Amino acid sequence: MSNLILEKKWTKWYPENISFKNTKKIKKILCSSNNFKKEDFFIDKKNQKDLTFSKETSEINLTQKKAYETGFQTGLLKGKEENTLLKNKLNDLFLNFENSLAKFENELCSQLLKTVLKISSYVIGKKIDIDKQILLNYIKKIINKEGVFLKKPQFIIHPKNKTLIEDIFKKFLNSHKWTIVCDDGIDLNGCKIKSESVDIDATVDARWQQLCRLIYLEEY
């Protein structure tokens, strides 16, 4: 029988999942397998549904897995980019902070130097001629030891010196938010500086003691 005759006689049938309708006569059916008819079989809908469901579930799981991996990689890449940006911002912040801190320290040293010189000149009644660099280095030592930030600083002076001090150091006191406190126990030619972190005694007795100590230690 030629292929042409077969193609005309037979109709192609592609069952997805088939079973015998009459399983009790399966031996008889198998013996006469040459006489199979389409009616002898049926599609197992239940198994077919289970197979379809299983296939769909696998496809869904695979899709979810791919979506998760894609999302994870995307999130990881975005996180790395944001982390890099954050590091750059922090580096810039710390760099600016260090520069500002150094600038503030220099300005504070300069202001303290001027303050000490003016107060010293007022105490002895004439302009003093000293090595400013030595005094500046000493002030820097105090700042490095005690810290550049004075919290709630107070300038303690004798009441009779209040007007004079306010006139001379008004700009400095206002810009650094210092508070003037009057105390009758402070000598006319002295003062004290107090804050939450440090106390500086600049009375005449304290300055003489400090001067003697510096001479003995040969710091000058």
Swiss-Prot record:
Keywords: Bacterial flagellum biogenesis, Bacterial flagellum protein export, Cytoplasm, Protein transport, Transport. Pfam families: FliH. GO terms for biological process: bacterial-type flagellum organization; bacterial-type flagellum-dependent cell motility; protein transport. The keyword NAD does not apply. GO terms for molecular function: cytoskeletal motor activity. The keyword Cytoplasm applies. It is found in: Cytoplasm. One of its GO terms (cellular component) is bacterial-type flagellum. It comes from the Bacteria. Belongs to the FliH family. Needed for flagellar regrowth and assembly. This is Flagellar assembly protein FliH. The gene is fliH.
